[in-house]
Amino acid sequence: MQTFILAGGCFWCLDAVYRTLDGVQDVISGYIGGHTAHPSYDAVCTGATGHAEAVKVVFDEEVIPADVILDVFFTLHDPRQLNRQGADVGTQYRSAMFPADAAQEQLFRDAISRAGELWDGTAVTTIEPVGTWYDAEDYHQDFFAKNPGQGYCNAVAVPKVNKVRKSFAQYVRAA
């Protein structure tokens, strides 16, 4: 098993997409990259904590390659947008990757380079020290599945899930 920590907009969308992929064993929403201990969602949303909304993606590389996990990441968010994704604005929505070691850092750098093939422009995705991870509140975990009629999810997460299902069909879990 391998674990990647990735931030790219609202963690509800990242969580929703990664849960559709075969080989992904767990997805945990949380906060990382800031200076406040044990931040709350409300505090992170102010931007004052320095934390990003992020996900820990735990996956089996024998089922889904690490490069695919990372290519999905760059397919489902726009890495050219600094401190925002769509209407979500603030440093908590930054595009960032938090490597556990030098090998992951190299994988992440290679993925950022590949992102240039997907998007016209330069990625502003940062590679940041892993630091301390804080799980988000329980109601944020698997939010999309627990709140299927929620307006934000229907407007933002559903198109991302559909895009990844189409682009990475061979890795999507059987229904």
Curated annotation (Swiss-Prot):
It is an enzyme of class 1 (oxidoreductase). SUPFAM superfamilies: Peptide methionine sulfoxide reductase (SSF55068). InterPro entries: Met_Sox_Rdtase_MsrA_dom, Met_Sox_Rdtase_MsrA_sf. GO terms for molecular function: L-methionine:thioredoxin-disulfide S-oxidoreductase activity; peptide-methionine (S)-S-oxide reductase activity. It catalyses: L-methionyl-[protein] + [thioredoxin]-disulfide + H2O = L-methionyl-(S)-S-oxide-[protein] + [thioredoxin]-dithiol; [thioredoxin]-disulfide + L-methionine + H2O = L-methionine (S)-S-oxide + [thioredoxin]-dithiol. Keywords: Oxidoreductase. It comes from the Bacteria. Pfam families: PMSR (PF01625). Gene3D superfamilies: Peptide methionine sulphoxide reductase MsrA (3.30.1060.10). The keyword Oxidoreductase applies. Its EC number is 1.8.4.11. The active site is at C10. GO terms for biological process: protein modification process. Has an important function as a repair enzyme for proteins that have been inactivated by oxidation. Catalyzes the reversible oxidation-reduction of methionine sulfoxide in proteins to methionine. Belongs to the MsrA Met sulfoxide reductase family. This is Peptide methionine sulfoxide reductase MsrA. The lineage of its organism: Bacteria, Bacillati, Actinomycetota, Actinomycetes, Micrococcales. The gene is msrA.
